Amino acid sequence: MKREWWHSLTVYQIYTRSFCDSNGDGIGDFGGILQKLDYLQELGVGAIWLSPFNDSPNYDNGYDVSDYYKVMEEAGTMEELEELIAACEKREIVVMMNLVLNHSSHLHPWFLEARKDRNSKYHDFYIWKEGTKEQPPEGGGAFFGGSTWEWVPEVQEYYYHSFSVMQPDLNWKNPSLRKELYRMIQFWMDKGIRGFRLDAIDNIVKDGHGGNDTHSEQIHTYLMEMNQNTYGKSEQILTVGETGGATVEMAQQYSDPESQELSMIFQFELMGIDGIRSGNWDPKPYTLPQLKQLFEKWQTGLEEKGWNSLFWGNHDFPRVVSRFGNDREPYREKSAKMLAVLLHGMKGTPYIYQGEEIGMTNVSGLRIEDYQDIESVNFAEDRKKEGWEEEKIRTYLARNSRDHARTPMQWNAEKHAGFTAGTPWMAENQNYEEINVENSRKNPDSLFYFYQKLIALRRKNDTLVYGDFRLIEEENPDIFAYERNLGEKKLIVLCNFRDTAAEMKARYDLTKGTVLIHNDTESLTKEVWKLQPYEAYMIELLQ
């Protein structure tokens, strides 16, 4: 496998409007990120991935772009973005931007012209079907609720939208549209952007029946064309495609260097293991062996061909420690460290979502009217129409809402968690006086420094980056154990997922190994690997 510069780095995802506000308007911005670059450099990340910053009416927090060449006013100015990119370059931090290429805003000039006249050159930039106002075309439901079709009386046609009615899908069959998108990507590359996260990129091909054909070979054809015309011209560009339903075989094709499509993808099989935000949002129980099998499938499936992205969550899912760990004291930080060891010990490029490195948790006690995420708002409205009791709706929102990940970053114990001098666009989590960056940096044993150590390990340990993956005792219900092998070196990772002690038979004499990272003070014996609640080890052995 050819070694790439992005194999050993760690990416930090910034949800800009919730990260840091520099001008007191209550919304995070480029100036706020610039103020915190030294913090990110201290953490050790090699890239920052910024949430959408193109001009937008913000019905979906920037995922509805009205101008691909401008930045949204709330985020700052083009000059401030250029200053941020330059400051990152000095710190050897790559800036990645979000590209929303499946759809635009309904207020984009292309769509405003398209909806006026069937003969407009922009009409075919979107997807239309004839019908009557009373009889829409056949099709499934949109991701954010309701029909995928919306009537436009001016042209007597329906337009297609995978997400909300304010996000009409672009027609990738049109070569003129694709040319416009490629020109735009080159514009941002010329600005110094060195990474792109391609939003919902597996939705760009439609099945002809009111749905997205996420398994179409045509997607790969388009991606190869885009690669050849834009980012593929430079080895310094990192790309990751959001392909939620991708199989291992599809991921191999997307991320195999021979295919010349993408560096890697985000697949969401892990994100769906417990039923969060999938189907009707009902909880889905799972076992630790099932979790192991899922990780093993992706680790071994992309071992020789392609590359994994590693993540526990992002802006679309509840907080990591609340979902997969234990956010109650005394186990919040310890379980978060365990989850970090498990993920960062695997093969792939790790992604950290802002606040994960200090153990931010889900917010509690929200009323239905407090939720701001468009998906949560629509879910509540739809369930009310179905006759659900308010308490049941609140329970489902408390477990599933994307808003948990979008509360302001907790910098210190001051008002509004140090996020803003004004009124925050979204209320902060009320545990900010305890859980914040300032407290973490004061404590040498904190989660922040634990992440710092893991990130540094990946930069210098080839076994951690390129070693083969092998699961150990896949049926053990309490301990997730695996090894990584490269040449004469072996890494052993042991993680106890329980709030009680657990053990397994020793496979190797780890007393002769070098402990690379550990979240407890206990030591292992030759005969039995006994782990305390949420204890985690990463140990290196010479074979």
Where are the model-predicted features located?
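Active-site and adjacent substrate-binding regions of carbohydrate-active enzymes
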Residues: 1-543
